[in-house]
Amino acid sequence: METPRYRRVILKLSGEALAGSQGFGIAHEMLVTVAEQVVEIQKLGVEVALVVGGGNIWRGIAGSKQGMDRANADYMGMLATVMNALALQDAMEKAGAATRVLSAIEMRQVAEPYIRRRAIRHLEKGRVVIFAAGTGNPYFSTDTTAALRAAEIEAEAILMAKRVDGVYDSDPLKNPEAKKYDRLTFLDVLSQGLGVMDSTAASLCMDNNIPLIVFDLNKKGNIRKGIMGESIGTYVGRDK
C-alpha cells in the first residue's frame, strides 16, 4: 500500500467550485465529485477537514459594493458557507464518510460549535470535518479561514481546489497566453500579487510553514495525487 505524503490536510473549496458549470448555486455532480475523492483518500488513512466558501450563493464584498454595510454583507456570506457545508455533509455521508459540520457562528440545530480540541478529536476518530461560517468574523475571507484552521489543527498542507489547474501570471480563462507556475514561494505570491489567496491568508501560511497545493478540482484523482506528493497544479511553500 502506498504511503501518503500528508497525513492531515485541509481541503479548501471555493463556493464557485461547487457551482460547477452552472455558475451559481450548488451543482449535484460537484458534490459527488468531492465526496468520492475525499472518501478515496480517507481509505489511505488521511485525516481530512474541509473549508468551504460561499461565493456560489453570496459574496460579502459584492454586497458592500452595492452599498450594504460590509459587516452585514460578510455575515450573509458566512451563512452561505453553512448552506454549502450542509450540502457537502449530505453528499459525504451518502458516499459512506462519517462527517461533522463545525460552525464558527453557533447554530446548534444544524452544526456543532467550532471547538479546536473537538475538531481534532473528530479527525482522530476518522470523521471528515467541515468548517463552516468562516472565522466567524467579518472582513476575513474563507482563504484566511483555511490558513487559520490548518494552523490550529496542525494540518500538514492545504489543498486548494480551483476551476483551473494551478497558479498563472494572469487569468488563463481570459488570457490564452497566461504562464503557469509549477512552484512558488509565499513571498512570490505576496510580492507579485498573484491571485492564489489573499495576503492575510498567504502570510499566515508562510509564518506557520503550511504548504499550499493549488489544483483543478474537475480532474478526478487530483486530490489523491496531491496527498501522495505527486506533482499536480502549483506548489506554494516557504521555499521553492
Curated annotation (Swiss-Prot):
Give the UniProt keywords, A-Z: Allosteric enzyme, ATP-binding, Cytoplasm, Kinase, Nucleotide-binding, Pyrimidine biosynthesis, Transferase
Q: Which reaction does it catalyse?
A: UMP + ATP = UDP + ADP
Task: Please describe what this protein does.
Answer: Catalyzes the reversible phosphorylation of UMP to UDP.
Q: Where is this region: Involved in allosteric activation by GTP?
A: 20-25
Query: Where is ATP annotated to bind?
Result: 12-15, 55, 59, 168, 171
Q: Which organism is it from?
A: Desulfitobacterium hafniense (strain Y51)
Q: Which HAMAP family match?
A: PyrH_B
**Member of which family?**
Belongs to the UMP kinase family.
Record text on activity regulation: Allosterically activated by GTP. Inhibited by UTP.
**What's the protein name?**
Uridylate kinase
Q: Which domain of life is it from?
A: Bacteria
Where does the chain bind UMP?
54, 74, 135-142
User: Gene name?
Assistant: pyrH
What Pfam families does the database record attribute to this sequence?
AA_kinase (PF00696)
Q: What is its main location?
A: cytoplasm
Gene Ontology cellular-component annotations: cytoplasm
